[in-house]
Amino acid sequence: MSTYLIGDVHGCLDELLALLAQVDFDPQHDTLWLTGDLVARGPASLDVLRYVRSLGPAVRMVLGNHDLHLLAVYAGISRNKPKDRITPLLEAPDADELINWLRRQPVLQVDDELKLIMAHAGITPQWDIETAQMCAREVESVLSSDSYPLFLDAMYGDMPNNWSPELTGLARLRFSTNALTRMRFCFPNGQLDMICKDTPENAPAPLKPWFELPRLVSPEYSIIFGHWASLEGKGVPEGIYGLDTGCCWGGNLTLLRWEDKRYFTQPAFKVEAEITNADEIAAAAKDPFSYL
């Protein structure tokens, strides 16, 4: 019985199955943790959702920003971008079932026995575990409710970017969503910066990666995150594990077996995502992952 943690899949089903075959994954006995962004950019978002859903209780996943964007597109709130390659999913006969299943998935996983915390982007240094769980439950509650389109319509935006217990309503939900699914850099006081997508060594002062700031989460807990492919899993402190290694961009899909902390990788079979606009082309010239 093993615990396997895998980074952002982004519609790369073949690589996911090949990686699981490397470790002889058995859903009857093993548990699979997924850092979110199951969909978009890769060729098989529909089949990834079908497969992950079929695993039932063997899966512990969190939603990523691309998963939330899919929900917004399906609800008619956001535009379907061709580069996301989700049209087959949107038009699938079981799309309603898959979308309703997806929106009932958590944005945070905490396992007190394994001392593991997982969120797509990480945990803001302004939160302790209890606050993170409270804010995650609030987001999950509205996503699973009939009023979820109202939340999806309001979730886009970078403000507020500073945590306060006094935040309420949609502003509070937007901060929590950004902290859990979009965060990369923070100011020294823990305030989120939602603009910079650079690598840590190229980020302007005084910005720091969220994991370099003092944290309120107990050091007894390890934090698992995805989202930040340009890190390639490197440069993070002890007890922090970044698992997005850019499979859909021609990198790898990475798996961490928790019991012995052994890594397994599956190289991308081909580059699946395309760089399509001037901003992305300019960013990619500086850093091929900066536009994620």
Swiss-Prot record:
One of its GO terms (molecular function) is bis(5'-nucleosyl)-tetraphosphatase (symmetrical) activity. It catalyses: P(1),P(4)-bis(5'-adenosyl) tetraphosphate + H2O = 2 ADP + 2 H(+). It comes from the Bacteria. Its EC number is 3.6.1.41. CDD domains: MPP_ApaH. Pfam families: Metallophos. Keywords: Hydrolase. PANTHER family: CYTOCHROME C5, PTHR40942. Belongs to the Ap4A hydrolase family. Hydrolyzes diadenosine 5',5'''-P1,P4-tetraphosphate to yield ADP. This is Bis(5'-nucleosyl)-tetraphosphatase, symmetrical. The lineage of its organism: Bacteria, Pseudomonadati, Pseudomonadota, Gammaproteobacteria, Enterobacterales.
